[in-house]
Amino acid sequence: MSDDHSIHSHTQGLHHIKKKRVGKACDSCRIKKTKCDGKKPCNRCTLDNKICVFTEKKKTKEKKHPSGYVELLEARLDILTRSLEKLIELSRPHLQFIDDIITEEKSVDQEKSSPASSTPNSSSSDHHDDVEEQNSTGVVAPINKVVSYLIKEQGLLKNIPLEWEQGTEIAANFDPNRNLKSSSRLFAEHKGEAFIGSPVTSPQQMPTSNPFRRTSMFKEELESPSSDHYNESIFSQSVDEPYIKKEPNSAQFSKGTFSPQQQQLQQQQQMLNQFSLNTSRDISDIESDSSNKEDGLNSGSVSPPTSNYRSFSLFSDSNGEPILGKTSSLTSLTNKYENHSLSSPQTAINPVFNNSTTGPILTTLRRNSSSHSQKTLGSIQLQQKPRGSVHKPVRNHSRVSSFDKRMESTATAAATVAAVSGSVQLSQNTTPQNLPHLDNSQNNNYLRDNGMNNIGAGSVGGGLTFGAPSFTQPLSPSDDAIVYPTNQFTNRPATVSTFGGGLDVLVDNSLDPFFNI
């Protein structure tokens, strides 16, 4: 029982470990609302091949200071201020800029104190409080002027962030006896801007070039009288827009780019004398959609307007003749074929014999044209008739009407091959019993005339041999029968069924199993 209890407690411990919650899930698991293991990167982002990011939200919490902390800072600030004033007073004989600042400050205070007593009450309460504080305190030590001089001239706060520069300027010019309320309001506004994230620069480091001035200069350039004439800055297009070569036909020409539909409207409105890209002929969809770099479509050059100027347009030359580019339309290709009568060449039906022993025995037999091509040519010729073109009759060759004529022509060709070059051989066992229609006496006379003496029923494996074979390509194992050239010996061709397929015909030392002659 004790062992079972320990195992049960151990499994419960593992179960509690597995159910441990993760403090924070990654962004991907948070969006998908799936469980995240909290690792960096987590297992699910690793399997999905994604970047695992844990976004931390910054919560603005006010600092909790202990009691008396603010009073302590105020006392410390007062001590540091008095110490700095004492140091400035002691270093005045040694530093010339301190003497100049103190002298200037005294003169300014004297000028402000004299008209302040005679002026009426100010409308602003802040200004009234500052004047009262100034009259009561008198001349203040020029500590703020010294700090401002060190910041601007000596680079006291050179490495601070840019957004804190205005805040330091406000703090440097702060005087609790003069501008307490105004300085506090300005610093609070600056703190809110810095918290949002908008950088605020100081007046001495504001950029000299104003972006609004650039816009106004560009507007003045567009509205200037010279904008009526040629100006590259006006006609220059952006990178995203297509570049079109603009060549004027007169002093007044359009300044924009037109679509093919607008170009057709511009042709109809010739009274406006606006430049049109298509004045010579209608263009097809392929020509209008294609980009011809050779024709100058991608060049942004613009020619200046001249009087009586006739230039090359995109689709015609100076004489107005159309220019056919590389991307000509399919309609022009069809018209080109329709204007010419096409007919298939007359193919050879019967083999041509040659008596020379060195040259080729048979000429190349061309295959008959397909019915599809003949129908296509016929449809083209039917389209030629209403157009008044000269009609030429198609010379269609005659086809072999029966299988017997093909057999006779093939046997005649094979007999000629055997008579001239002696290149016919039966490669299988052939006996006189397998050849009932073969006359041995005639075969002997035939072989004796050709200078062959090796004849017999069992000379080569018990078969009948006629010379050495000279086939460049072996016979197909699918042959069912071979035509034996016996037209000179008998009145009909002899067929020896020694192979296992169809009938092959030798054409230029190559086998054609489809009887394409």
UniProtKB/Swiss-Prot annotation:
Residues 113-124, 261-270 have a biased composition (Low complexity). It comes from Candida albicans (Yeast). GO terms for molecular function: DNA binding; DNA-binding transcription factor activity; DNA-binding transcription factor activity, RNA polymerase II-specific; zinc ion binding. PROSITE patterns: ZN2_CY6_FUNGAL_1, ZN2_CY6_FUNGAL_2. This is Fluconazole resistance protein 1. It is found in: Nucleus. Residues 26-52 bind DNA. Residues 250-260, 298-307 have a biased composition (Polar residues). InterPro entries: Metabolic/Drug-Res_Regulator, Zn2-C6_fun-type_DNA-bd_sf, Zn2Cys6_DnaBD. Residues 388-398 have a biased composition (Basic residues). Transcription factor that acts as a negative regulator of fluconazole resistance in C.albicans. Also confers fluconazole resistance in S.cerevisiae by activation of the PDR5 gene. Residues 106-137, 250-270, 284-307, 378-403 are annotated as: Disordered. Keywords: DNA-binding, Metal-binding, Nucleus, Transcription, Transcription regulation, Zinc. Its main location: nucleus. It comes from the Eukaryota.
